[in-house]
């Protein structure tokens, strides 16, 4: 066993979605604990604040994004970073059976605040180590959680592993606008206006911090081209990005192979 010097900085993951945001945490271990606590603390108010942020249009957008990603009735779905279930709720509608949809998230508080159907399965877990067998799902979604994982390569390899051959991937994320004016506008909206509005929703101070953190992680996130390259490196095919109104990125991909050709294997522990 190698003894690590206590003063040695913790290495940054090889394909981290962004540099450490030291205004909030110092190390990768700190980041995971910080995010879990912040999401747990803000779970009760999350949906109401999100509805304000999106002006009530979020459900319709998520519904259409999943359709563009290829989600159809009868598909077996995994929603990674399920949170309070905003994306999973639309997946339940589109599949026609909530029992076909599984959600996984590292924040038990967020999942406890969800209003999802009782027949949908919710499990605690992380994108980098999914507790499911190989070749298990027809469709994998993730809504606005790409910035919160530790290593894109590790997580994307897990996504590819649990998808069946021919299975589809749809990752939704907010991307920093290229236009300087729109970037300034979105920054001030998320770092200033939304944190101010949270005071009318809740006395929980972490709500304001959460939305400022969201913008800072968006601003620091790796460019879409790097996300696409990392997805392709896992062996996923038909990798592409669809962009809505200049900020909503939809990363889509398909697992190689013909549907029905995969063999379900033992899950990782």
What are these regions (language model features)?
Residues 128-139:
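A short acidic, Gly/Pro-enriched loop at the edge of an enzyme's catalytic core
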Residues 138-152:
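A short SAM/SAH-binding and catalytic strip from SAM-dependent methyltransferases
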């Amino acid at each position: 066993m190698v003894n690590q010097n206590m003063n040695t900085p913790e290495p940054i993951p090889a394909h981290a979605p962004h540099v450490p945001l030291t205004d909030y945490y110092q190390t990768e271990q700190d980041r995971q604990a910080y995010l879990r606590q912040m999401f747990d603390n803000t779970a009760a108010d999350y949906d109401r604040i999100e509805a304000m942020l999106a002006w009530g249009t979020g459900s319709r957008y998520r519904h259409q994004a999943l359709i563009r990603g290829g989600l159809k009735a009868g598909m077996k779905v995994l929603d990674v970073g399920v949170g309070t279930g905003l994306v999973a709720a639309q997946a339940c509608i589109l599949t026609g059976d909530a029992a076909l949809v599984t959600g996984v998230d590292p924040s038990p508080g967020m999942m406890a605040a969800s209003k999802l159907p009782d027949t949908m399965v919710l499990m605690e877990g992380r994108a980098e180590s999914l507790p499911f067998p190989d070749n298990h799902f027809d469709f994998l979604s993730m809504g606005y959680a790409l910035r919160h994982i530790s290593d894109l390569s590790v997580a994307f390899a897990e996504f590819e592993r649990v998808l069946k051959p021919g299975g589809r991937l749809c990752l939704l994320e907010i991307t920093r606008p290229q236009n300087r004016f729109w970037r300034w506008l979105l920054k001030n909206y998320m770092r200033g206006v939304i944190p101010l509005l949270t005071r009318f929703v809740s006395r929980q101070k972490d709500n304001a911090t959460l939305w400022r953190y969201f913008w800072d992680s968006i601003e620091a996130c790796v460019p879409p081209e790097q996300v696409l390259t990392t997805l392709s490196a896992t062996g996923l095919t038909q990798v592409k990005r669809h962009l809505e109104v200049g900020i909503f990125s939809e990363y889509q991909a398909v697992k190689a192979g013909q549907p029905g050709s995969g063999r379900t294997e033992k899950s990782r522990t």
